[in-house]
């Protein structure tokens, strides 16, 4: 084993990355954020069931159809998986979600391998640096957890790393390098539109290096690949780039509706997500190098910097937005740090200090990995839907008390439900709401909330004395911790009541 690991230094990091991702897939569950479930899983699964949960498709919209502010490329790939599930299984929604997590975990192993290849190309004499990069990408911090969920910001990482690899394979880009870089950047942009900033930021680098043919080649290849990935727009809408235009239009007018922050918000995010004290060393290593850096170094660092500057200037500052470039930042950051450290007389005299800093990092990282692997996001909402699936429910109602968080209907096995948001619909008394359900009575009513949950339940029970209490599903301990760290993440209980003959129907 030792001999094999020495000859194949990528073997052990890949194995560790695989095991940690399988653990995160098997022992975790739920979803991390709104978008990874509702804009991916919920949409794709509903299409496979002959529904259109998010009303993305123009033939299901009333009036003038309007493009949803997302794209079909990645969601379409998940739709094909759900169609495959119908042929081969599994059939239970939770089992399907598990398979999705495993597949995403396997897919993310490419990031580890490509980080190693990029490091080998940028620092060919430092094989230990490339191995260290692979270990960081495989087994540190939140990467095992993030790698198994359906975030587009993570799905675009392997092709983006492929693009960077193509850019650093040689100082004078050859046609093979141009194809690899262009296809990688094009696919990444097709999955996550903002990755196009990488391509834009690459232009001045190649111009400065006078690589005219490479600039044209990468540009044409990337645009061609991206255009092919937008082909579903022609099928669905009858014209190209509809989703892209819808995405730009939505974000130009609704950006202020989302979390904001100062211009240095993402610097703080990087310091946290990379985990101290390594985060300080990696950021210094990535951006301190001067004229001594090789030309292919700037083909990675400048696009990363451009991507970060773009998002720092943008008003909507959600932490996940910068995830696409973080693995590349780790790669060049570690190379730059090792290069600077080896040239520093001060660090030559303080080798033990650096060893202590990295030991501290790995202790913190191991704790983060251990805490995050069993993460089951939005536990109460998911388990409530799984309860309905076990009851073979056809129609249900959700009364949202303290938040407008939608129920993850995918786990219920049905797409027929009624949503009442008490925060915005307070003018409708419970009796009137219940009467509106008579045409298709829900079998269960789910009350979702926290502080005012008991009050809302009491109001509905007074209007419908026949409601029968079934169970209460509490949030997970992890959900409570996340809420405590950042209250913007809602935490709710779900109380389930059977309607039976409780509705005021004639």
Where are the model-predicted features located?
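Signature aromatic-anchored transmembrane alpha helix within multi-pass, membrane-resident enzymes
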Residues: 10-18, 223, 227, 289-293, ...
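Membrane-lumen/periplasm interface segments of specific transmembrane helices
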Residues: 188-189, 196-281, 300, 310-313, ...
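Specific aromatic-rich, kink-prone transmembrane helix
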Residues: 114-117, 136, 143, 155-172, ...
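Hydrophobic, aromatic-rich transmembrane alpha-helices
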Residues: 117, 269-295
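Transmembrane-helix motifs of polytopic, lipid-linked glycan transferases
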Residues: 98, 102-125, 162
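Catalytic lumenal/periplasmic loop and adjoining terminal transmembrane helix
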Residues: 30, 234, 346-496, 500-503
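Perimembrane helix-loop-helix junctions
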Residues: 2, 164-185, 196-230, 283-292, ...
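Short acidic/glycine- and proline-prone juxtamembrane loop motifs at membrane-interface regions
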Residues: 29, 33, 145-155, 318-319
């Amino acid at each position: 084993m030792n001999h094999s690991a020495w000859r194949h230094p990528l073997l052990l990091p890949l194995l560790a990355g695989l095991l940690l991702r399988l653990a995160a897939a098997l022992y975790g569950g739920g979803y991390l954020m709104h978008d990874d479930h509702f804009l991916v899983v919920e949409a794709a699964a509903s299409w496979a069931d002959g529904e259109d949960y998010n009303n993305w498709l123009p033939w299901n919209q009333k009036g003038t159809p309007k493009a949803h502010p997302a794209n079909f490329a990645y969601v379409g790939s998940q739709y094909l998986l759900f169609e495959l599930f119908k042929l081969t299984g599994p059939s239970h929604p939770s089992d399907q979600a598990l398979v999705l997590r495993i597949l995403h975990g396997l897919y993310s192993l490419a990031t580890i391998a490509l980080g190693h290849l990029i490091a080998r190309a940028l620092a060919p004499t430092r094989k230990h640096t490339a191995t260290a990069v692979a270990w960081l990408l495989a087994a540190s911090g939140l990467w095992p957890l993030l790698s198994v969920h359906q975030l587009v910001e993570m799905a675009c990482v392997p092709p983006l790393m492929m693009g960077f690899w193509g850019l650093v394979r040689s100082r004078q880009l050859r046609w093979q390098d141009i194809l690899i870089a262009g296809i990688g950047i094009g696919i990444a942009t097709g999955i996550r539109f903002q990755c196009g900033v990488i391509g834009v930021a690459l232009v001045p680098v190649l111009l400065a290096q006078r690589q005219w043919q490479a600039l044209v080649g990468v540009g044409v290849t990337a645009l061609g690949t991206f255009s092919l990935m937008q082909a579903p727009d022609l099928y669905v809408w009858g014209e190209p780039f509809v989703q892209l235009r819808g995405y730009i239009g939505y974000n130009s007018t609704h950006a202020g509706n989302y979390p904001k922050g100062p211009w240095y918000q993402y610097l703080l995010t990087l310091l946290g997500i990379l985990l101290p004290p390594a985060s300080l060393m990696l950021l210094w290593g990535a951006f301190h190098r001067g004229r001594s850096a090789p030309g292919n170094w700037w083909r990675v660092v400048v696009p990363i910097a451009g991507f970060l500057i773009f998002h720092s200037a943008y008003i909507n500052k959600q932490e996940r937005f910068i995830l696409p470039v973080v693995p590349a930042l780790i790669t060049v950051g570690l190379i730059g740090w090792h290069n600077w450290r080896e040239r520093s007389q001060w660090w030559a005299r303080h080798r033990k200090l650096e060893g202590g800093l990295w030991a501290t990092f790995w202790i913190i990282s191991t704790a983060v990995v251990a805490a995050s692997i069993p993460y089951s996001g939005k536990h109460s909402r998911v388990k409530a839907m799984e309860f309905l699936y076990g009851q073979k429910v056809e129609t249900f109602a959700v009364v949202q008390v303290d938040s407008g968080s939608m129920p993850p209907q995918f786990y219920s096995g049905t797409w027929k439900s009624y949503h009442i948001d008490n925060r915005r619909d307070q003018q409708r008394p419970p009796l009137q709401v219940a009467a509106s359900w008579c045409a298709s009575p829900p079998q269960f009513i789910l009350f979702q909330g926290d502080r005012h949950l008991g009050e809302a339940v009491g109001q509905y029970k007074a209007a419908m004395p026949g409601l029968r209490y079934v169970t209460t599903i509490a949030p997970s301990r992890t959900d409570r911790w996340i809420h405590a760290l950042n209250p913007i993440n809602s935490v709710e209980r779900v109380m389930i009541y059977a309607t039976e003959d409780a509705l005021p129907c004639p």
